[in-house]
């Protein structure tokens, strides 16, 4: 399924991510930029997810362009069973990937890959391009 965002879109990326958070066993997120405005859309669900001792959250982000907000990282650092890695290299390697992976012990894992960083506009009304792929639809 393709998510393009924008004000006329019925489905938002954040609403789909919230649905997947509720049924995941492990979550891996890689985004260039992590903003508090985007984290707030998912924070309650992530907090509940991380309260389960069987679950794990891993996030990779960067300080590239100074856009990632320290307050967002501080909020994530307070979550149980959460690992946050930050790339500080702004000269040689510029991490620009965006992916949200929801692993399930059942084998029904889901990935969202595209252009959306973790920001409010990228997850709600911004013009983005993301595709959802599921292990069931794409077993290889």
Language model: regions and residue ranges:
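PLD/PLD-like phosphodiesterase catalytic module centered on the HKD motif
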Residues: 1-140
